[in-house]
Amino acid sequence: MIKRAICLLAVLFSLPAFASELNESIQTDYDEHLGALFDHFHRNPELSTVETETARRMALELSLAGFDVTEGVGGTGVVAMMENGEGPLVMMRADMDGLPVEEKSGLANASRAKQKDPITGNDVFVMHACGHDVHITSLVGTARHMAAHRDEWTGTLMLVVQPAEERVLGARAMRDDEIWERFGKPDYALAFHVASSGTAGVINVQEGSPYAGADTVDIIIHGVGAHGASPHRGKDPIVLGSQIVLALQTLVSRELSPRDPGVVTVGSFHSGTKHNIISDRAHLQLTVRNTSEATRQILLDGIVRIAENMGRVAGLPEDKLPEVIISNESVPPVVNDAPLVRRLRAAWV
């Protein structure tokens, strides 16, 4: 899969040429350099905001390819520029952070890396479980191919290595660090994401919104603690939380049009410390996905309405109703530029 993915960005700006020559060039670079580089990245993932070694290696690779490299943009972000005559400024972006997941694949290049989680402070296993190792390896492959074929294109190429995509922090941090003012605002911006459900070697591109917007939501439930043998003396936050989880399932199925995509997923439910104690608190963690602002508002408003009113049903006073916290870690849907999509399709076909 990595071999095919490396082809993607290199193909985007190749002028008409024999496909076999392009494939042969990419295969050679994969065999001689990129394959080992991918293994290195996969074995050595780093968590969001602390991708220091990954950023350092990416800066080195892009510099060796002939790009002017700036490190530390928006934290650990990297920007690499190559000017090649008159033409548009084209940005290609790849994300580089891993996830706090223990890899159990048993593969030769499996990650056994551990790192201190900047959120919890705990040492956790880290894995490239979302394909970002493919993305950054592909960006290096693109850089090397474009630098070696400068006679086939003109303009300015901006390669962006984005940190903290998984925490929805990196793009904002690079923007706040004035990436556009310092390096120029691109005429075209390109990125891709691998998909395990797709067919290897196939590039999928569509007009409209291929990737949904996302919100991170927390629900804090304030119950009344009691002994497990005397539940009538308390307000059980686990029961209330369970009722909220079930009620949330109606938001997509009964409040959205069947033609309007949306997702409300409860990914975490934490409460209690012991078998025979009814806790006084529960914490739900949700992800909410949408492809339009109208859908987003329906879902977020519905979460607040359900959580608060289920608290009322349970008999909680108004000042103890469940709290709904909508994080600033949110992103809008990706909306592809239709003319650019058509242009790319024509080039690939």
Regions found by a protein language model. Give the residues of each.
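Bacterial N-terminal signal peptides
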Residues: 5-16
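Sec/Tat-exported extracytoplasmic proteins
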Residues: 26, 30, 38, 42-45, ...
